[in-house]
């Protein structure tokens, strides 16, 4: 298994030509399988060319892991074939639901209850059994928390442990939720099982009101998210980190600048980890 490292980029058709023609590339790329499954010909060849430049991981949109309706087994089989075709070792999905009698075109929050933990965990286990690999779930941005019986961090942690799955820690979503629900973003990071974190997402958001942020993926990363990313590296270790940019897409040069900023922060975090390990070893030796 190839280990995921470094800084990745969510691949979008708007800058695919620039990506293919670039002299240097991100350490990995990510696509939503729904946007590519079933396509052959030119589209399949285009994606294959991209995969030659950087390893591919997948971030799904419509599994609806928390939805009220039965899992779409045919869809899951299609995802499995896509993962096999492109040798994708990481498939992540949102801890939310997207179907309720029809596709809702949004990521809706799951009630944070013990019953929901058990329900979602059972569905994740079923998906993992079909795919033959661990599912990676992502904490989502929310604007309401219906019928919550527990804090978000506890809910996410319980699902991870009960389903024996992994976490895509979206740092921007953590910050957005901390503002929207008046919670502590740093405490959320502290509460996550560090050994379950497979990789991170960062993105920009829009401030609509003083206490309302929208996760748009349509702007540069904001300073508070940079600070939270740095903290995540400090307490969780330096994890592979992917930049998402879906709207108001800037030039390729600007995207590369933001990727470079993440890389610099990772390098600094790795140096700090090394110093901490040396200090810990010296302290043990003295004792």
Curated annotation (Swiss-Prot):
It comes from the Bacteria. Coiled coil: none annotated. SUPFAM superfamilies: Xylose isomerase-like (SSF51658). Transmembrane segments: none annotated. HAMAP family: UPF0276 (MF_00697). Belongs to the UPF0276 family. This is UPF0276 protein ACIAD0933.
